[in-house]
Amino acid sequence: MDGVAVRLARLKKEAQREWRRKWRQAAPSTPAEWKALAGEALIGFLKIALIIALPFVVLVRGSVFIYEHGRTPVWMAVLVAAFLTGGVVTAYAVWIARRFTKRGGKGGRALVMPLAKWVALPLVVFYCGYSLLYLASVHAKSAPVRAYYTSVHPLLRLALSTAILVDRDILITDTGRQPDDYGRMGLPESLRSRHYRGADGWVHAVDLRTAGRGTLKNWSVQLYFWSMGFDTKRHVGTADHLHVELN
């Protein structure tokens, strides 16, 4: 038994020595090679990030674009964007399935409808339903703010829920208001606040906490909402916050 243990220890050392030799051969040896490796790693990371983000961008930015430029009802905009998102998810699912099953051509096309029905549709429906109906209490400053969540415009709810997936520290400090709320906050009454319910019955604005979150986080969240088609403004009312609204 001792002889076996000795041989195993020797084999382990030889394997480690061979691994270190191969690593030295494969590892970049010059600054130019390290720079090239870093560039390839960055490109790979960006590709992965783009692949992950694309369905959410299609859903959120697509619904806002259709709503604003197509002059369509909000639920129609959500439905069309969800359909397009389902197409993206189906394409991903087909690609993954073909990689594992080695089915291509007509065999790959035969996967489209089953994967659309049993993978893409449930995922998109679940995500939209979750985003539109649920807000965790940890992301609302108070119970009244959370209670107002379903009164917020559906497109803003989709955008908020998607932002929360990435930034788990987002805190909504205000949603719907009444005219007399401004007096209680020591502010002049606003006649055209987007925090009021609009003619369509929805609240078109929310405020997000910025205190204690850091400049980069706040800037990233503001950039996200702006790129998704929302108006954003960082201002001081009763407290420093980020105002996000849908026109």
Question: Model-found features: residue ranges?
Answer:
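Active-site-adjacent substructure of cysteine-protease-like catalytic cores
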Residues: 167-202
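Active-site acidic/histidine clusters and adjacent loop/turn architecture
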Residues: 118-172
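Membrane-helix boundary connector in multi-pass membrane proteins
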Residues: 101-105
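Membrane-helix interfacial "entry" motifs
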Residues: 36-40, 106-114
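N-terminal post-signal-peptidase region of extra-cytosolic proteins
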Residues: 147-159, 187-195, 229
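N-terminal targeting leaders characterized by basic, low-complexity, disordered sequences
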Residues: 1-84
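Short, structured coil/loop segments at alpha-helix boundaries
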Residues: 36, 40-43, 71-75, 145-157, ...
